[in-house]
């Protein structure tokens, strides 16, 4: 952490001299430190290598044990802008979409459940951050007898592509997709400046030019020129860097039901052997060190140390909410909402349909309905041709959902969206493709639908460990309000249960599954249930509007009748067992009543619990990787959840004690100011034009007007200690009435059950 090993970034149009003035106090008088260690290059292999490794499996049944296989190649050093960009394009060509040739071959082989690798789901970031580039492709959910066949399929498919050639339309689509991404420079919630810093680091940290990764126009033009003079440019890359490259690793992950117990036993053995060798003095030193660690964990930072951290003051914050311009065209044919914002010549289109048009029992299909629309082809073209057209003529079209509570109602706002973007000059193509997808879908391809369902099931199963806290939190809240209940049906643990059953139904009762999809489409895709939300420059609207109205007019008139759902809320405590060494512990409830004046302080309280009480008790002392408190202002739900947590009962006790912590809270002015600033920072979260347009639409649908937003901002800015102390009583409701959902190992769940007494937790297997 010596300054000699640091890199300093500034983003903005501020004077350079001012930047040096900011740095000077931190660097003056600091002596140079040791030189930064260099990351050495990997020694090249003379021949490919195969490695087999075990991983923990929950089931001992052979039919339930799924293998995974990956084939990876080490590529040249990441110091050639043209090669780096061309490698990203090649990865997208091979794996970037379900219609990409290598990904398609793996999917259609039927030998696995889900594809992974470089380029899948835009997974190109890590590749660019390493000193040497790489490419990998793999399949998971494989039967043991098919492992070698999967490796052969990957190598044979690449060989066939190098020899027979890659479809030129696929190449054009991928080149356009990568170019659109580079020119749009849209990274969602990540500020552009931060992304630019990260890009610069990809070369700078290895001693290269930090500006090199930022200049993409020259290598992009060079690649386009090469494709004209050398049409088989990518086939040549494929042959040179993959097929003829001996630096290849085949990694086979083999399920082992005993692996977890072997790990634990090995650890216990190592501890016993180490303890046996310790002298009494060494034991005493370990004891004293442990006690000192505990003291440090329990000792708050001194005011003097905290004062060293630079911070804003309340006067630095904007007092008024930031508003987003919205123009509404209501002509009796359905709403068209337009957000005039500068978008650099891009139109963002959100075409939405009200899910309340459907009976509740069909909602779980929305785990796969959007993908079925876009990835099964249409009456005019198969899904490969459809994917090529989307890639070549647009910046992408994706399915999305907006699920939210709304002010003044127990009903949710639940919408299905097609979200697309294109250069304004291609807006006609964007809406023509959308019309084709919405009016001419093909749901009758049984094998393709089965592949989509298998992939979604595998995606959810793979997310259990990295995103377990989100799944547990959502399942807790699904017992209390409609919006969370809908989310649980379409993208939660309940959705995983549905997808597992759906695979069997596709095999055994295909006509009924097909009928369900057709019924969903008939009821949902209707003019009366539609909402068009557009974002672009005001001057571009005359070129876009005719295409919007044309698509709206083409939608069927029948369907779209709104239904009221009656959710069957499950509020019992649940334990969900998975093969893991850590737990995810959730607890929460819907508060009986939250006074309107408390919404602002509730945001402060949840933020404060995250950075103080939960940080200290659950993370520092309890050993969890993370813990959070959340508050939903629409439903009044308050919930806690932990991440990668070795505890269960201890964590629940910390949650229950949060109310006393708030009651006794006495923050000094500086600490209270920091908490307020943190909440305002989230209220004023960074948004690019597409996100602004979607956020404005969401606010209008849910009743979160600018007036309501201003009231809550005023509450946040004026929060005092007594406001937070009064919330202790509300948090008592969570302690006394909260629902508990825990995901973790069978052993940990049973231990928690025994510690707290029988029958407080119903345990069932999840994985």
What are the language-model segments listed below?
Residues 1, 16-34, 164, 244-247, ...:
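Extended, regular secondary-structure scaffolds
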Residues 1-26, 513-548, 736-737:
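Non-catalytic, conformational "gating/processing" segments within enzyme and secreted inhibitor domains
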Residues 5-11, 65-76, 104-226, 246-256, ...:
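M16 family metallopeptidases and their MPP-like homologs
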Residues 21-27, 150-155, 432-434, 545-551, ...:
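Short amphipathic alpha-helices in soluble, non-transmembrane regions
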Residues 35-105, 136, 191-214, 275-374, ...:
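His/Glu-based metal-binding/catalytic segments typifying zinc-dependent metallopeptidases
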Residues 56-59, 121-127, 221-225, 236-241, ...:
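Generic recognition of flexible, low-complexity loop/linker segments
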Residues 229, 233-240, 280:
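Extended alpha-helical coiled-coil "stalk/arm" regions that scaffold and mediate dimerization/assembly
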Residues 718-767:
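In a subset of proteins, long, contiguous C-terminal domains/tails are tracked
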């Amino acid at each position: 952490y010596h300054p000699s090993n640091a890199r300093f970034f500034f983003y903005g149009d501020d004077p350079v001299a001012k930047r040096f003035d900011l740095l000077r106090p931190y660097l003056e008088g600091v002596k140079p430190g040791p030189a930064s260690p260099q990351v050495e290059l990997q020694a090249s292999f003379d021949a490919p290598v195969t490695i087999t490794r075990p991983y923990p499996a929950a089931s001992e049944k052979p039919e339930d044990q799924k293998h995974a296989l990956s084939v990876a190649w080490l590529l040249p050093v990441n110091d050639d802008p043209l090669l780096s960009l061309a490698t990203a394009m090649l990865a997208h060509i091979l794996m970037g979409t379900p219609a990409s040739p290598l990904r398609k071959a793996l999917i259609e082989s039927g030998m696995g459940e889900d594809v992974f690798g470089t380029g899948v789901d835009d997974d190109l970031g890590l590749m660019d951050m390493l000193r040497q580039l790489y490419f990998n492709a793999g399949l998971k959910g494989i039967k043991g007898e098919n492992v070698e066949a999967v490796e052969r399929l990957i190598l044979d498919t690449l060989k066939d592509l190098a020899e027979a050639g890659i479809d030129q339309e696929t190449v054009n689509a991928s080149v356009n997709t990568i170019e659109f991404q580079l020119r749009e420079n849209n990274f969602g919630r990540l500020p552009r400046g931060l992304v630019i810093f990260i890009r610069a680091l990809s070369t700078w940290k290895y001693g290269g030019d930090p500006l090199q990764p930022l200049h993409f126009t020259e290598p992009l033009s060079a690649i386009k020129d090469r494709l004209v003079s050398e049409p088989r440019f990518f086939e040549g890359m494929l042959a040179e860097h993959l097929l003829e490259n001996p630096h290849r690793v085949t990694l086979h992950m083999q399920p082992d039901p005993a692996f977890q117990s072997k790990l634990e036993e090995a650890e216990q053995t190592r501890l016993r052997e180490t303890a046996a060798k310790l002298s009494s003095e060494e034991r005493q030193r370990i004891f004293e060190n442990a006690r000192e660690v505990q003291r440090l964990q329990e000792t708050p930072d001194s005011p003097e140390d905290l004062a060293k951290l630079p911070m804003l003051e309340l006067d630095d914050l904007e007092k008024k909410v930031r508003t987003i311009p919205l123009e509404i065209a209501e002509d009796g044919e359905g709403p068209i909402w337009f957000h005039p914002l500068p978008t650099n010549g891009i139109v963002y289109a959100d075409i939405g349909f009200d899910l309340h048009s459907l009976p509740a029992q069909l909602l779980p299909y929305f785990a796969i309905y959007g993908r079925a629309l876009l990835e099964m082809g249409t009456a005019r073209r198969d899904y490969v041709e459809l994917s090529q057209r989307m890639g070549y003529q647009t910046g992408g079209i994706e399915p999305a959902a907006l699920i939210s509570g709304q002010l003044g109602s127990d009903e949710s706002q639940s919408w299905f969206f097609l979200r697309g973007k294109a250069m304004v000059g291609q807006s006609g193509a964007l809406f023509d493709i959308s019309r084709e997808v919405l009016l001419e879908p093909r749901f009758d391809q049984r094998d393709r639908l089965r592949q989509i369902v298998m992939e979604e099931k595998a995606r959810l199963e793979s997310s259990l460990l990295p995103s377990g806290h989100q799944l547990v939190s959502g399942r807790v809240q699904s017992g209390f309000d409609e919006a969370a209940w809908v989310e649980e049906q379409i993208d939660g643990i309940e959705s995983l249960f549905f997808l597992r059953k759906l695979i069997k139904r596709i095999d055994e009762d295909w006509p009924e599954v097909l009928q369900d999809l057709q019924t969903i489409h008939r009821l949902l895709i209707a003019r009366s249930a539609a909402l068009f939300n557009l974002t672009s420059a005001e001057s571009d609207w005359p070129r876009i509007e005719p295409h919007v109205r044309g698509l709206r007019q083409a939608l069927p008139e029948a369907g779209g009748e709104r239904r009221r759902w009656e959710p069957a809320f499950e509020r019992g405590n649940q334990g969900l067992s998975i093969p893991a060494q850590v737990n995810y512990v959730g607890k929460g409830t819907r508060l009986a009543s939250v006074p309107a004046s408390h919404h602002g302080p509730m945001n402060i309280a949840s933020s404060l619990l995250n950075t103080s009480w939960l940080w200290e008790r659950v993370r520092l002392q309890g050993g969890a990787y993370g813990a959070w408190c959340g508050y939903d202002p629409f439903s009044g739900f308050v919930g806690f959840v932990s991440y990668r947590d070795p505890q269960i009962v201890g964590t629940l006790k910390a949650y229950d004690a949060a109310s006393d912590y708030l009651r006794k809270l006495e923050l000094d002015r500086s600490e209270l100011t920091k908490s307020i600033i943190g909440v305002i920072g989230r209220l004023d979260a960074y948004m690019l034009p597409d996100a602004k347009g979607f956020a404005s639409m969401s606010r209008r649908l849910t009743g979160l007007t600018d007036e309501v937003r201003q009231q809550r901002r005023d509450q946040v800015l004026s929060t005092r200690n007594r406001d937070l102390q009064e919330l202790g009583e509300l948090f008592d409701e969570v302690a006394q009435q909260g629902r508990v959902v825990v995901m973790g190992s069978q052993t940990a769940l049973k231990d928690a059950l025994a510690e707290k007494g029988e029958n407080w937790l119903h345990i069932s297997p999840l994985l």
